[in-house]
Amino acid sequence: MTESQRIGQLFNVGLENDRLDAASRKAIIGDHFGSVWFRAKTTIGVAGVRKVADAVQALATDATDGVDFFVAANQEGGLIQALAGPGFSTIPSAVDQGKLDPSVLEGRAARWGQQLIDAGVNLDFAPVADVVPKGTEAQNAPIGQLRREYGSDPVAVGKHVVAFIRGMTKVGVATTAKHFPGLGRVEGNTDFTSAVVDTVTTAHDPYREPFARAVSAGVPFVMISLATYDRIDPDHLAAFSTKVIHGVLRRDIGFGGVVMSDSLTADAVSEIAPGQRAIDFIDAGGDMIVLGPIAVAVPMADALAKRAASNAAFRARIDHSALRILEAKDAAGLLPCSG
């Protein structure tokens, strides 16, 4: 792979609505972006999504040196279900999933995962591992208000998180534990506001239990939140924090997989130049940059290339992150040599 192709592997870019348009096709080929996601809800069903996913995979020869794409979606359930229509089940919210016995949830997750596989989707931005304290749901905009949490007890939530991961893994869907180190005790939603601050969570917080269980279960991706955690690193958003990524997630919990950003086109980071967002995330130890409009990825990729050209240590970070992503793709059978 060339340096630009390795940089491209670091990006998971949003598709426009439910299609692969000409501008997206051009950007994916030109900047070698290695993963995509359905960022808008669609009701075109399994067959319609499969048509789009197949069109993306057909770009691999020209875009990514023959390496297939992670094709992703937010398929949590409840209000957060991107893919619907013929062939897709209506997935209950995590609150309702949390009422199921974990063994039952595992079976249902396998069924939902098979629908994703049939649609050509091989990566789910789920499960949510955030814990919302009982009685605070209405004040918790990103998770509790939307019924995205499995519950209020970290141990019980962890069991359901693992069940979801195991069910999806059985049928070949990679999963993402999110939003580390937790959005269950904030009020603002980082998608729509900046300066979201958690004043409670600590580096050894009991509410990190679901993430630790997910890591022990082999989850390949962990998504980092865009909130600030005053008691871990008050000076940086979590996605830009070495203390959060290296100190807590990698060193303390032992995660060796792909660290994924929450969307770096969210309002929480809107005041930071796109290129700087990408640099700060990789500098902090992140691997895969998730973002919405694909046009924003172009200046991000340019910024990474310029920094790598003048900084050997940063270039090594890029190469290490690209390797982690390629290892995840190998595990998912997406490399030409995957057995």
Where are these regions (language model features)?
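N-terminal hydrophobic targeting/anchoring segments and the immediately downstream early-domain regions
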Residues: 1-82
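Glycine-rich anion/phosphate-binding loops
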Residues: 98-111, 155-158, 204
